[in-house]
Amino acid sequence: MSRFTYAYMMMTRLETLKNNLQAAFGQDLALTESLGELTLEVAAEQWFSACTKLRTDPALRFESCIDLCGVDYLTWGNGTQPEEKTGPVTRGRYAVVVHLLSIEHNWRLRVRTWAPDDEFPMVSSLLECWPGVNWFEREAFDLYGIVFEGHPDLRRILTDYGFIGHPFRKDFPLSGTVEMRYDPEQKRVIYQPVTIDPREITPRVVREDSYGMGR
């Protein structure tokens, strides 16, 4: 199979998927295409029902959820200073993103929803749609504090059980809040306030002016 033939097949399959999504969701469809990939945006109140349709509709058949993650858009589009906001406006601070695969139709889809409350981000659990997201949702809860309503065992999975805060949030201090060490007097591991002084790190590129130019 030539590269041209393969590219044509991929484009045809992408158009078929777009048409099938339009037929399934109608006026509720919010679809974007970039770099040969489709992203479907779903309102939080339709998160579970939309994902169920994506899995069960014979024309879509996304049997497998290969990834689920949280995203914190707090500083999205910002420079090093708060007033330097140049990026696009988002629908909220926290989003949940899933990447789906249809083995039957051999196509993929990214689906995103926004938590409606920035102070207490919560969306429905997708455990009944794809049981494999169990630990993915626990990870997003642990690192971002996103609550998945209906999850039967929403506990931390990566950090300590007594950990305070959610380390992947953009406002979580880079140095953390506590550090641990072994105390020889108490003969056990103890926690104490972190002793690292936080500082702003501004990335910059240092290179010769003639870098990359012909010599």
UniProtKB/Swiss-Prot annotation:
| SUPFAM superfamilies in UniProt | Nqo5-like (SSF143243)
What InterPro entries does the entry give? NADH_DH_suC (IPR010218), NADH_quin_OxRdtase_su_C/D-like (IPR037232), NADH_UbQ_OxRdtase_30kDa_su (IPR001268), NADH_UbQ_OxRdtase_CS (IPR020396)
> What residue ranges are annotated as transmembrane?
none
Q: How does it sit in the membrane?
A: Peripheral membrane protein
Report if keyword Membrane is assigned: yes
- The lineage's top-level taxon is Bacteria
EC identifiers of the protein: 7.1.1.-
Q: Which Gene3D superfamilies match?
A: NADH:ubiquinone oxidoreductase, 30kDa subunit (3.30.460.80)
Keyword vocabulary terms for this entry: Cell inner membrane, Cell membrane, Membrane, NAD, Quinone, Translocase, Transport, Ubiquinone
Catalyzed reactions: a quinone + NADH + 5 H(+)(in) = a quinol + NAD(+) + 4 H(+)(out)
Please provide, alphabetically and separated by semicolons, the GO molecular function terms listed in this UniProt record: NADH dehydrogenase (ubiquinone) activity; NADH:ubiquinone reductase (non-electrogenic) activity; quinone binding
Task: From the Swiss-Prot or TrEMBL record, state where the protein is found.
Answer: Cell inner membrane
Q: Name one GO cellular component term.
A: plasma membrane
- Which range is the signal sequence, renumbered to this chain? none
Q: Which family does it belong to?
A: Belongs to the complex I 30 kDa subunit family.
Q: In UniProt terms, what function does this protein have?
A: NDH-1 shuttles electrons from NADH, via FMN and iron-sulfur (Fe-S) centers, to quinones in the respiratory chain. The immediate electron acceptor for the enzyme in this species is believed to be ubiquinone. Couples the redox reaction to proton translocation (for every two electrons transferred, four hydrogen ions are translocated across the cytoplasmic membrane), and thus conserves the redox energy in a proton gradient.
How does it associate, per the subunit comment? NDH-1 is composed of 14 different subunits. Subunits NuoB, C, D, E, F, and G constitute the peripheral sector of the complex.
The name this protein carries in UniProt is: NADH-quinone oxidoreductase subunit C
Protein source organism: Bordetella bronchiseptica (strain ATCC BAA-588 / NCTC 13252 / RB50) (Alcaligenes bronchisepticus)
